[in-house]
Amino acid sequence: MSSPNTWSTGSTVYSPVFSQKMTLWILLLLSLYPGFTSQKSDDDYEDYASNKTWVLTPKVPEGDVTVILNNLLEGYDNKLRPDIGVKPTLIHTDMYVNSIGPVNAINMEYTIDIFFAQTWYDRRLKFNSTIKVLRLNSNMVGKIWIPDTFFRNSKKADAHWITTPNRMLRIWNDGRVLYTLRLTIDAECQLQLHNFPMDEHSCPLEFSSYGYPREEIVYQWKRSSVEVGDTRSWRLYQFSFVGLRNTTEVVKTTSGDYVVMSVYFDLSRRMGYFTIQTYIPCTLIVVLSWVSFWINKDAVPARTSLGITTVLTMTTLSTIARKSLPKVSYVTAMDLFVSVCFIFVFSALVEYGTLHYFVSNRKPSKDKDKKKKNPAPTIDIRPRSATIQMNNATHLQERDEEYGYECLDGKDCASFFCCFEDCRTGAWRHGRIHIRIAKMDSYARIFFPTAFCLFNLVYWVSYLYL
């Protein structure tokens, strides 16, 4: 017979005391592992990260932070800077460049996106608490003193407000304040375009206090004060980012001496766009103008049309090239190249005009017949052909009646710049160059390409290496 305090089931005997102990153990396990008794909702699984690192932090009562802020702001005057009347307020600045670009050469400005940070000490914001730092949102910015920093060379500046104002405020228990904000600035950059498009520029970003001179506020750079992001995402297009440097200077004005902080971004222009759009087309047009030297001189419409077409094309190219530049009063490197190309093209047209003029104005055959019928009382002592020794080479100069024209004293001339077949023997023509009109195209075929190649050699060496 079993005891009244025990009961049995089959062959197992259970005691009420044992049952109570088991119940307590089960409740304890369930309290330690609530996941066994509660089912996670879909929202819980969405926020759950399997690789999340859990950090234990001391729990700060919300009421304590509120009390600290109320105590700090009680009697606080945000119109007065820290240590007013005692010493200047030292502000440490640093900057993170998110992106630069594009650069607008016509308006001489560039766009930059930065995170700008300022740090200073305000003894009025010291507090005693286990909390070392108060991480506050932008609502607290207007309740404490903030430096009146402005960007001196900005044409336009925008703060980011989506989805909330991109501003951050931190207050440490020793009175240190950190204030950061994100800005997009269109800053002025005076471009010197003498070497365009092989130019390099240093575009500044300058900031200082608007109303406090250096007796009131002093700016100072932090270590590693300017950092840059991934330059591959920058929209510089025609430029390459070379580097940066930061400086500090004092600017004297009628209202006082101000500490001005500057960051210079060094940019180098890429020539690819202008090589394709300007340099190669201009070179090809110049070479095309030389084709007229191989066309028969009697083909007046063909040579004239080619010359005029190349001149008009060069005029169009020079106009298009100027559209990407501001209206500066000096000559740029590209202006020089385009102008010289225009001169070569125009000279090719003038060359044919000169050749055609002297050839077409030769003496008519009827006049020659009249001269033969009524010969003048003169003695012809000119030889039909003459052998001239020049530069150790023998040249046979023959009179070419086809290209003769009326010259001094009614004499027929077969050469340009000379009125006798043997120009070297004429004392009044001593030192003159003997050029045959019929060979002007032959001379041009050599002179024009040689001169253009020499110009390119001097041009590219001067602008790229000197």
From Swiss-Prot:
Keyword Glycoprotein (UniProt)? yes
Tell me which InterPro entries the record gives. Answer: GABAA/Glycine_rcpt, GABBAg2_rcpt, GABRG-1/4, Neur_chan_lig-bd, Neur_chan_lig-bd_sf, Neur_channel, Neuro-gated_channel_TM_sf, Neuro_actylchol_rec
The reaction(s) catalysed by this protein are: chloride(in) = chloride(out)
Q: Which residues lie on this side of the membrane: Extracellular?
A: 39-274, 322-333, 464-466
Cited Pfam families: Neur_chan_LBD, Neur_chan_memb
Q: List the disulfide bonds.
A: C189-C203
Spans through the membrane:
275-295, 302-321, 334-358, 443-463
Changes after translation? Palmitoylated by ZDHHC3/GODZ; required for the accumulation of GABA(A) receptors at the postsynaptic membrane of inhibitory GABAergic synapses.
Q: Which GO terms describe its biological process?
A: adult behavior; cellular response to histamine; cellular response to zinc ion; chemical synaptic transmission; chloride transmembrane transport; chloride transport; gamma-aminobutyric acid signaling pathway; inhibitory synapse assembly
Under NCBIfam families, the record lists: LIC
Q: What is this protein called?
A: Gamma-aminobutyric acid receptor subunit gamma-2
| Species assigned in the record | Rattus norvegicus
